[in-house]
Amino acid sequence: MKTIIEDCTYVMGRGTIVIVELPDELLEYVGDFTYASKVKVGDKVKINSKEYVIKGIEKISTSKFVGLIIGGDDVDNIDNFFGKEIEI
């Protein structure tokens, strides 16, 4: 599945966090306008033709948006991630 990176930030000690809106195919509706991600820690994503392992997932309220933590200092310059396509 492909989607667009909405935002990106680096958090010291946690890694690079990319904010994406997950497609419906990667979500499970659990009720009360709340969704659970089918994407799991350890899954791989591809950004700019480079693969990264998901090291953590941050849920953002009850929306379809999640923050994927994809690594530490080994991640490319995050400025290259804004608005880019991510393959999950």
Annotate the PLM regions.
Residues K2-G15, I19-I88:
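Beta-strand/loop-dominated core regions that host nucleotide or nucleotide-derived cofactor-binding catalytic loops
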